[in-house]
Amino acid sequence: MSLATHLKYQQAVFHGLHFTPCTLEYGTLWSNAKHPERGSCLVCERPGFYTLTVADYTVASDFSVPFLIRQPFLRFGSFYEGHTSFEIEGFQTSTSLPSNYIVKEANISGRQNWHENEHYKGIEIGLSFAYLEK
């Protein structure tokens, strides 16, 4: 997944959460003005190089988002609250529980699922290899 693809994936997640963007001087705040109790996600980025996402939100209704990762991409962060489920082609259905992580992803596809009333809280940094090679 290139960084641009990662940002498109994030936007699909935010739309599934019924969040809309508000551009700030230092990033973009995604939230639902009609339901502020559902939380928000703040995305700060240097286009083409890295993205920092801070999230604290509750899912309003079930949804899923497909993903396709071709180019190597590095993600690391801390997932403090929530329970994710995802399907990766060629692997059994998997889940994630709160943890710290660092993962290099390449040449995988699948789907991630979110479930109504699940609460998620975490922080993630995504890095393009172009940034790492500079």
Where are these regions (language model features)?
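General N-terminal leader/first-domain-start detector
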Residues: M1-S40, E45
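N-terminal regulatory/effector-sensing and dimerization cores
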Residues: T28-K134
